[in-house]
Amino acid sequence: MSEEKTYPMTAEGRDKLQLELEDLIANQRPEITKRIQIARSYGDLSENSEYQSAKDEQAFVEGRIQTLKNMIDNAEIIDSNATAKDEVSLGKTVTFKELPNEEPETYAIVGSVEADPLAGKISNESPMANALIGKKVGETVAVPLPNGISIDVEIINVTK
């Protein structure tokens, strides 16, 4: 028997997924159902693009609902208090700089479900986060990049 996959995430990330799920169920699902009923009233379904479009959207929304339910049911909430205050871990925000003299960058380390690099959130599965997790402020870390080379970064700060 296979184990269910768990999804590491912050409580905030789980709450965002829950809100998305509630919106899909309460708003989008009924709206699509109405559109399907209206499109059916147009007659012949074989050449009814409105009907086909609504059915395609319904399939997408139903799939997303199932995915969200699975992720929420199997969420592993990250406890950033379980590690030392100055240690990089899931749920913490880390500031680092590429050596020798790049500008500091700050990212929150989150589960892959929440990752959004443009919003300053990187996945714990990314090469950068993977190299930083478990390290402490002041340490220099070699981060292997996908192209085979590595860069050295210095951890400047860690916060919750």
Swiss-Prot record:
Keywords: Coiled coil, DNA-binding, Transcription, Transcription regulation. GO terms for molecular function: DNA binding; RNA polymerase binding. Disulfide bonds: none annotated. One of its GO terms (biological process) is regulation of DNA-templated transcription elongation. Gene3D superfamilies: Transcription elongation factor, GreA/GreB, C-terminal domain, Transcription elongation factor, GreA/GreB, N-terminal domain. The keyword Repeat does not apply. It holds the Pfam family GreA_GreB_N. Residues 49-77 form a coiled coil. Belongs to the GreA/GreB family. NCBIfam families: greA (TIGR01462), PRK00226.1-2 (NF001261), PRK00226.1-4 (NF001263). Necessary for efficient RNA polymerase transcription elongation past template-encoded arresting sites. The arresting sites in DNA have the property of trapping a certain fraction of elongating RNA polymerases that pass through, resulting in locked ternary complexes. Cleavage of the nascent transcript by cleavage factors such as GreA or GreB allows the resumption of elongation from the new 3'terminus. GreA releases sequences of 2 to 3 nucleotides. This is Transcription elongation factor GreA. It comes from Leuconostoc mesenteroides subsp. mesenteroides (strain ATCC 8293 / DSM 20343 / BCRC 11652 / CCM 1803 / JCM 6124 / NCDO 523 / NBRC 100496 / NCIMB 8023 / NCTC 12954 / NRRL B-1118 / 37Y).
